[in-house]
Regions:
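Interfacial/gating helices of multi-pass transporter permease domains
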Residues: 27-50, 117, 181-189, 231-239, ...
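Interfacial transmembrane-helix starts/ends
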Residues: 3-6, 42, 77-92, 233, ...
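Helix-loop junctions and terminal segments of transmembrane helices
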Residues: 57-72, 290-314
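Membrane-interface junctions at transmembrane-helix termini in multi-pass inner-membrane proteins
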Residues: 131-154, 368-398
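Interfacial segments at transmembrane-helix termini and the short loops linking adjacent helices
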Residues: 106-125, 324, 341-373, 420
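Membrane-interface helix-loop junctions in multi-pass transport and translocation proteins
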Residues: 149, 160-202, 206, 390, ...
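N-terminal membrane topogenesis motif
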Residues: 1-22, 77, 81, 223-250, ...
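Interhelical loop/hinge segments that connect adjacent transmembrane helices in multipass membrane
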Residues: 2, 181-189, 201-245, 317, ...
């Protein structure tokens, strides 16, 4: 059901994101890692994530769709054949991409990023691509069998082990080699690969435990229709490629920062300072800005099939209220998060990253993106459900072009000369890109479907946020002279949530 799937995915996303934030807080505050370690690891992770997108992003949905179609007509044998062919095909693709990343690590780190220390992290991450490719197929297979919990549990397990292994490896490295940031970043990368292997092992064992049930279903299979390997692969690609174009472009968009920020900052600062500035943005700021999206991410996974079903039956009335609810939820969460991070950027950073508290200006600028990113998530999911996948793609291309242009223009400018120079310029470029992407998608959505959100509903949310902001500022300033700033911001944020909900 819609509500059940929303809850499962919401809880999973929340757990994964919270553990991820804990992991980032630990790394950033760890002596020897800090902002420089974030720069090294994050630059490597962005190109790794792009390879993952190519190998796996559209695969779960494609496999899920084909498997569910076969099972709907009783063809369990055909459904399992899709799974087997997908494992072999995309396992081979993942293995190839692992080899490419491994062999190109030196060139990418030295020439693309201009962060030579990232080479070891890229090498450590490369084996993970193979395992993630197969894991994506297994998740898709069980999703097609309407078993969402298998994939959700595997994501939680992967994130828990990543954090635990990261802490263990970083502590071992720091005690054996000292605070060598390059080695510590590589240790974090190794932890990522190990956690993906553990996730793969969990899903493999899960599949083995279900193999008897699957075998019995195959014996009683109905309406089996032979399809060749080439035909099956082409069917998967026909579904996965349109779904992957957007995420691939988004991955390229992320790598714009990796390839332009350090290069641009070197115009007016040293290599070391440039890495620290870049690490500050991609390590701390991006983590905080993206975190609220986990409250909203569950909607994107459930809106696509729901809207697609409504389109197929040409009956949108049942889903109108759910679409409106998803967009209002994005506003209800996004607007106060934006305002809260803008008002309390400095105390939030001091609370979470006491050893590396810099970056308040960056957080204030970047926080503007939150509401637009959350709205874009849901709008793009609705458009995909309507079969209008080209529209989010167009928005991404335009947004990416704007981000690249602004990065190239603003990042090389010293922020002492112009406020929106340096990393402030990169943050502003990201905000501009996200606004443009939402506007393009939103304009087209209004042409295809009636959203039904009234202006007075938006005004209510804005007024509630303003009231929350005024009360929270008063509470924070009143208690600041009595208790510590860290305790004060915790108290203020608790009151903020309570006031807003009331």
């Amino acid at each position: 059901s819609f509500t059940k799937n929303i809850l499962i995915l919401l809880v999973t996303h929340m757990i994964v994101k919270i553990i991820g934030v804990v992991n980032k807080i630990y790394l950033t505050n760890r002596e020897g890692f800090g902002d420089e370690g974030n720069a090294i690891y994050s630059s490597a992770f962005q190109i790794y994530a792009l390879f993952l997108t190519i190998c796996s992003i559209g695969i779960p949905n494609a496999v899920s769709k084909l498997v569910s179609e076969r099972l709907a007509i009783g063809d369990s044998k055909g459904a399992h054949k899709v799974f087997k062919i997908a494992v072999i095909a995309f396992g081979a693709l993942g293995f190839t991409c692992s080899i490419i990343l491994f062999t190109c690590a030196h060139n990418i780190s030295h020439n693309w990023f201009q962060i030579p220390e990232a080479e070891l992290s890229l090498v450590a991450l490369s084996p993970s691509i193979f395992f993630v490719s197969i894991t994506a197929v297994v998740r898709g297979y069980f999703n097609g069998r309407e078993n969402i919990s298998a994939g959700a549990n595997s994501q939680t397990i992967e994130q828990i082990f990543r954090t635990v292994i990261t802490i263990i490896l970083i502590e071992v490295i720091s005690r054996s080699t000292g605070t060598d940031t390059r080695i510590m970043a590589a240790g974090a990368a190794i932890a990522t690969t190990m956690s993906e292997i553990i996730c793969f092992t969990y899903l493999f064992k899960y599949y083995k435990s279900a193999s008897r049930e699957i075998a019995n279903e195959m014996k009683n299979s109905l309406n089996y229709k032979y399809r060749g390997i080439r035909k099956t692969i082409s069917d998967i690609l026909a579904v996965s490629i349109p779904m992957s174009i957007g995420p691939i472009l988004a991955g390229i968009n992320k790598n714009i920062d990796s390839m332009t920020i350090v290069r641009g900052l070197k115009n007016f600062m040293t290599d070391s300072s440039a890495k620290l500035e870049y690490g500050m943005l991609v390590g701390k700021i991006d983590t905080l800005v993206v975190f609220p999206l986990s409250f909203n991410a569950a909607f994107t996974s459930t809106l696509i099939p729901m809207v697609a079903a409504a389109k197929a039956s040409n009956n949108f009335a049942p889903v109108q209220r759910k679409i409106k609810f998803s967009l209002l939820t994005a506003l209800l969460i996004g607007i106060p998060c934006t305002v809260g991070m803008m008002l309390f950027a400095k105390p939030i950073l001091e609370l979470l990253f006491p050893n590396q508290p810099d970056g308040a200006n960056l957080l204030q600028i970047s926080a503007i993106s939150i509401t637009f990113m959350m709205l874009s998530q849901n709008v793009n999911a609705i458009l995909q459900g309507l079969g209008k996948t080209i529209i989010p793609t167009i928005g991404l291309i335009v947004g990416m072009a704007i981000k690249l242009a602004l990065n190239l223009i603003l990042v090389p400018i010293n922020p002492n000369v112009f406020f929106l120079g340096g990393t402030n310029g990169a943050a502003f470029a990201t905000v501009s890109s996200n606004i443009v992407m939402f506007v393009i998608s939103g304009m087209f959505l209004k042409k295809f479907i009636k959203v039904g959100i009234q202006k007075r509903q938006i005004i209510k949310i804005v007024l509630a946020t303003v009231m929350m902001a005024i009360c929270t500022i008063f509470i924070y300033n009143s208690f600041l002279c009595i208790i510590s700033s860290k305790l004060c911001i915790i108290l203020a944020l608790v009151f903020a949530v309570a006031i807003y909900l009331v």
